[in-house]
C-alpha cells in the first residue's frame, strides 16, 4: 500500500496527464483505428496506431540473439476523446508508454495493465513494464472506475488485433 505522500504524488500524475493529454489529437496515417465507448458514463475514445518498419534498432525490436525480429515498431498512438480524468489520463499514459514497443510487447503491457485493474488494489508482482501507467493501480479499488481506466487500453488492443489479423 502506498504511503499518503506517494498516493498524493500518484494522484498528481493522474491529474497532470488528464490535463496535458499526451498523444491527444488524431494524426493521419495510422494503420489501424478503434473507437470505444463506455456506455455507463459516456467516456469515449478514438485511437490510431502508427507503426514504422521494425528492421531498425528500435526498442524491443531484437530477438534473443540481438538480431532484428522484423516486427514493426509503434511510432505513436494518437487519440481523441472525451471523458473523466481517469480515462483521459489513462489514454495519455498509454500514448507515452507505447512508442518504441512492438505490437507484441504492447499486447503484453495491455495484459499486465488488465491484470492490475482486476487486482482490486493488490497490484501486480512487477509493474515496472507499465512505466508511469502503474500509478493507475489505485483505480482498481473502485470497480465502477476500472472501465474508465481500461478504455484506451481496449482501443489499443483492438488496433493491434486489427494489424495482427491483417484487417488494417
At which residue positions do the language-model features occur?
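Structured beta-strand/loop patches that form or line metal/cofactor-binding pockets in enzymes
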Residues: 20-55, 74-81
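Intrinsically disordered, low-complexity terminal tails and inter-domain linkers enriched
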Residues: 52-73
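Short, thiol/selenol-centered motifs that function as redox-active sites or metal-ligating centers
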Residues: 82-88
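Glycine-rich, flexible loop segments associated with nucleotide phosphate handling
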Residues: 69-78, 127-131
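Functionally engaged cysteine thiol sites
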Residues: 41, 84, 148
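C-terminal binding/interaction regions
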Residues: 2-19, 23, 101-168
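Alpha-helical support elements that line or immediately flank enzyme active sites
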Residues: 90-102
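Basic/polar, acidic-poor N-terminal "presequence/leader" segments
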Residues: 1-12, 47, 72, 76-77, ...
